[in-house]
Amino acid sequence: MLFMEDDEQIRRYEFKRALEELSKLHGRGTELISLYIPPDKQISDVVAYLRDEYSTSSNIKSKSTRKNVLAAIESIMARLKYYKTPPPNGFVFFEGHIATRGDQTEMYTKIIEPPEPITTFMYKCDSEFHLEMLKTMLEEKEIYGLIVIDRKEATVGFLNGTRIEVVDNVQSQVPSKHHQGGQSSRRFERLIEIAANEFFKKVGEIANNAFMPKIKDIRAIFLGGPGATKEYFFEKDYLRNEVKEKIKDLFDVGYTDESGLRELVEKASESIKDMKISKEKDLMNRFLREVRKPDGGLAIYGEQAIRDALEQKMVDLLLISEGLRKVRYTYRCPTCQAELTLNQEPNEWPVCEKDGTPMELVAEDDFIEDLYRLAKESGAQVEIISDQSEEGKLLKQAFGGMAAVLRFIRKDNVQMM
C-alpha cells in the first residue's frame, strides 16, 4: 500500500526537475517571459496587463526580438482563455524562444502549478527564466539547530532535512588547567575561567545570530559534546531564551568539529523517530539487513531485477535515489511496430533489426517517474531517498541509486548491478 506522502514525494521531485530544466534554458536576447499569477488574481486583469505589455513590446528595436516577444505574449493570452480562475496555488507561465543549436531558436512553453501559493504577481521578460520565487518552495521545511562544544572548540550548524550545514567552527584560547599550588595557581585558574567565559559568550553569540532569524522554523536544537561542558553551557545565560527553549536534548559526542555535528545528528536521530533523516535511515537499514543475509534475503538491486520484480508485483518497498538523472528513450519501427528502449540517447539513430527501417522516437520518460509509476501500479511502497545523507549516498554509489525489498523470496533471486 502506498503512503499518502508518496504522492507528495513525486510531486516535489517533478517540481524540482522542472526547475532544473528551466534553469538550463536561455534566449538569444531578452525574449523569455516569466509570468507569475497568484490564486486570487483575476484572469481578466492578467489579460489586460498582457495587452499593455504587447503594446509596449511593439516598440522593441530588434526585429527578431520584437517578433519573438510578441509571439510569446500572444501564446500566453491564448492559453489563458481556457482558465476562468487560477488554480488553488496560482500558476506560472514560462514562454519564449529558447536557443537551440547554432543560431537556431524554438518556441518553448511550460506552465507550472507550484506546491505552495504564489503570493506576488510578476511579469519579467529576460534572457533567462526567473525562478527565484519557485526555488524558495524547494527549501527544506524540516530544520534543526546543532551545537557541539567543549572548552577547546565548538561548531554550530543546521540539519536541513538530511543535509548538515556548518555555520561556524571556533577554536578557544582557553589554556590547560594549572596543576601547581599557591597564589599564582589560583590567579591562573581565574584567568582560565575568564577565558572560558569569553569563549562561551562567543559561541552563544554565533548560535543566537544563526538561529534567531529562523527560530520559528526550527523544530528543535540539539546540543552535544564530551564531558560536562555542554551542561554548563546550557544552564548558564549564553543562549537567548528563545534559543534555549528549542533545545530538545543534550547528547554525549566525542568530537566538536564537523564530524561532531554528524555524530550529534546520528545520536539525535536514534531518539527522535519523526525526523526525515531517521526515516531514511530506518528504510535503508531494512534493506541492508536483507542484503547482509547469506542468501541476500528479500533484497534486490539493479534496474532489470527491480523492473522484473515490479512487473510480477513482488516488491514491498522500493527505494530510489533523488540524485538519479536518467531518461528512458523508447523507439518504434513504423512498419512492424517493434520497440526498442534505451537508458541513454544513442550516438546514432537506431534502425529496426528486422527490416532496417529508421525507428521513430515515441517516448522520453524520466527514470524516477517511470519507476514510480510501475511501483504504484504494483502496490509497492515507494520512497525517494535524498542523496545528502550517508544512507542516501550509499544507495546511490553502492547500489546504483535503486534498491528494493521483496514481499517474498523467489527461487531465482539474483542481485544484478
UniProtKB/Swiss-Prot annotation:
**Record-annotated disulphide pairs:** none
Gene Ontology terms, cellular component aspect?
Answer: cytoplasm
Q: Which UniProt keywords apply?
A: Cytoplasm, Protein biosynthesis
- List the subcellular locations: Cytoplasm
Q: Which residues form the signal peptide?
A: none
Q: Which Gene3D superfamilies does UniProt cross-reference here?
A: 1.20.5.170, 3.30.1330.30, eRF1 domain 1 (3.30.960.10), eRF1 domain 2 (3.30.420.60)
Provide a Gene Ontology MF annotation, just one.
translation release factor activity, codon specific
Under the heading Pfam families, the entry gives: eRF1_1, eRF1_2, eRF1_3
InterPro entries per UniProt? eFR1_2_sf (IPR042226), eRF1_1_Pelota (IPR005140), eRF1_1_sf (IPR024049), eRF1_2 (IPR005141), eRF1_3 (IPR005142), Peptide_chain-rel_aRF1 (IPR020918), Peptide_chain-rel_eRF1/aRF1 (IPR004403), Ribosomal_eL30-like_sf (IPR029064)
Q: What does this protein do?
A: Directs the termination of nascent peptide synthesis (translation) in response to the termination codons UAA, UAG and UGA.
| Family per similarity comment | Belongs to the eukaryotic release factor 1 family.
Xref: HAMAP family: Rel_fact_arch_1
Q: How the protein assembles, per its UniProt entry?
A: Heterodimer of two subunits, one of which binds GTP.
Spell out the protein name for this chain: Peptide chain release factor subunit 1
Q: Which organism is this protein's natural source?
A: Thermoplasma acidophilum (strain ATCC 25905 / DSM 1728 / JCM 9062 / NBRC 15155 / AMRC-C165)
